[in-house]
Regions:
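Active-site neighborhoods and metal-handling regions in enzymes and metal-associated proteins
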Residues: 1-228
Length: 228
């Protein structure tokens, strides 16, 4: 059942790397579909219901964590943290999407940040979070860094750009459902090189005055999966 000696690399009976990648493709498509449905004037509570409808239409409503959509100042909060559900998306605003759908036996996990207008700082934040993600991911590829070392690197990369890294989103395992029954430790806490397809790198950055933030997450994978 567990092909690895290290219990933190354990998988369940339905684990299949190829199917995990298909779950990832469905998840990334769902994030984009949800983002496309967000309109200025929409309340955050309405946005979450819209996101759930989209996931249901895609056969992805069952998830291993709740559906999160955050607008404006609520983007400084992690999923599950208290936030104003009546926050309305503005014409010149920032928002993030964070979903963890299950496709059949396999878990997906994806998040991204988008802007609705031309606010340069918000746009830079949304762009920088992706740049930091890929900088950390390439560091993982080139150095064999441990999970803990990746988040030390992420902190430096974030601060160099003038943002604050939120360590309350420290990365995690992913597997056949439910991974939390198999392994439930943060990526930032492991002292070995995380394996491709088994770990999700989460990057959540915030404006130092906590006015807004940005989020991006995806599987740890090599460059070929991001060149399409």
């Amino acid at each position: 059942m567990n092909p690895h000696d290290n219990p933190l690399k354990a998988v369940g009976p339905h684990y299949d790397a190829a199917q995990m990648l298909i779950a990832r493709e469905h998840t990334r498509a769902a994030v984009e579909a949800i983002a496309a449905a967000m309109q200025p004037g929409m309340a955050e509570s309405e946005a979450i219901e819209t996101a759930k409808d989209i996931l249901a239409d895609m056969g992805l409503l069952r998830g291993w964590h709740d559906v999160y959509v955050r607008f404006g100042s609520n983007t400084v909060q992690i999923g599950g943290a208290p936030a104003d559900p009546h926050r309305v998306l503005g014409e010149d605003d920032i928002f993030l999407v964070d979903i963890g759908p299950c496709w059949q036996h396999w878990e997906g996990d994806g998040g991204d940040t988008f802007v609705t207008g031309s606010n340069r700082e918000m746009a830079r934040c949304a762009e920088d979070v992706k740049a930091i993600f890929h900088e950390v991911r390439r560091h993982w590829l080139s150095t064999g860094a441990t999970g803990r070392q990746l988040y030390e690197f992420a902190k430096a990369s974030t601060e160099r750009r003038g943002w604050e890294l939120n360590f309350d989103l420290p990365g995690h395992r992913i597997s056949d459902f439910p991974h939390k029954a198999i392994v439930n430790v943060p990526l930032s806490g492991i002292e070995f090189r995380p394996s491709q397809e088994l770990w999700v790198l989460e990057i959540h950055i915030r404006d130092k005055d906590r006015r807004f933030g940005a989020f991006f997450e995806d599987m740890l994978l090599d460059d070929s999966y991001f060149e399409r």
